[in-house]
């Protein structure tokens, strides 16, 4: 069992646009995916995918969507333990246009 520490976890949200990004206008989304992120979470995912049991230790409130996102991965051998904190994990958003151009918007 390996325990990873993720002091700054995130929810990584990727949205795809059906056309080019129109700055200053309303843009409709083609699709949206949300995955847990942060270096420790990512390492724990890779370990679990490789057959090694891993626990990601993250600062998160008990109702933080990050915890549900990690659990929803359904990876055997991947566990998550939360250290209670106030507030929610940051959300990083990537906007991908049809030509492959990606714009990232990361919370501090």
Residue ranges of each PLM-predicted region?
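Conserved N-terminal subdomain of the carbohydrate kinase-like
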Residues: 23, 49-108
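Glycine-rich phosphate/adenosyl-contacting loop at the front of the ribokinase-like
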Residues: 1-55
């Amino acid at each position: 069992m390996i325990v990873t520490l993720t002091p700054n976890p995130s929810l990584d949200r990727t949205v795809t646009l059906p056309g080019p990004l129109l700055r200053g206008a309303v843009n409709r989304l083609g699709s949206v995916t949300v995955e847990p992120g942060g270096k420790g979470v990512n390492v724990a995912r890779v370990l679990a995918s490789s057959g090694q049991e891993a626990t990601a230790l993250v600062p998160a409130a008990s109702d933080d969507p990050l915890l549900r996102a990690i659990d929803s991965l359904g990876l055997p051998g991947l566990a998550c333990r939360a250290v209670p904190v106030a507030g929610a994990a940051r959300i990083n958003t990537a906007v991908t246009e049809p030509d492959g151009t990606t714009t990232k918007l990361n919370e501090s």
